[in-house]
Amino acid sequence: MSSEEFFQAHPVFTHDEYAQSRESASPRTVDSLLRKHVASGRVARVRRGLYVAPTTGASAETVDPFLVATKAAPDAAVSHHAALQFHGRAYSVWSQVTFLTTHATRGFRFGPVEYVPVRPPEQVAQLPDMGGGVECVPSGGGIVRVSTCERAMVDVLHSPMLGGGWEEIFRSLSMVEFFDLDAVITYTLALDSAVTAARVGYFLSSHRERLFVEEAHLARLAKHAPKQARYLDTARAPGRLVHPWNLIVPEWVLDERWEEVT
């Protein structure tokens, strides 16, 4: 395979992937070739060890950002709000892409997009696919590793700041027509967080008809809800105590009156 054939098949690639394609070439030769292609403009360096090869005539910054995130670490998977955006289920389009990884790596910016690594919850970090709910989807000429809508739902409720806050979260999740509820509940319980179980249970109970939520689904989550009243989030905004979740939920969230929030 020639370098050009490799670039056409790999719009985003790592140094190691290119080195493997050069077979018997020495490390020095590989580095020299990459420098040559960067200098010619055929390849652009994203950061150390990570490159993009845009299609002819296109800007390097037009390469699929979800592919870039996938290649940012060996186990990287697009996550949280970015995963919902990938699936076309985000209320707002962001120029930030979060990705799960167990590797120590720094965030970076390439073009207009900020890439933010996120450590998976410690309860699932060492499990296969960091707890599951990660799929591989063709996109932008490559394969994107990305959280399913089910995992993304639970993750943004577990870490609402990574979902953009309650309005963005609820509006985005309301764009999802169907959830595998057993997958949602299984992953939720794996996180071993009473508050997260309550948040997920509250959301499902609030949309039970649309999402075909059965009492048995809610009962599984209710068993793990907090024993004492807890606020919906750390802002401790006043609201109404909602049973059986023992969550104090602000009125504007209860009624989903987003336009009234300033």
Residue locations for each model-derived region?
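Residue-level preference for alpha-helix termini and adjacent loops
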Residues: 12, 50, 77, 107, ...
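Short gly/ser-rich loop at a beta-strand->alpha-helix junction or flexible surface loop bordering the NTP-binding
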Residues: 15-16, 31-128, 244-247
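Residue-level marker of positions within ordered structural domains that often coincide
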Residues: 23, 88-89, 158, 205
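Short amphipathic alpha-helical segments with coiled-coil-like heptad repeat character
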Residues: 26-28, 91-93, 161-165
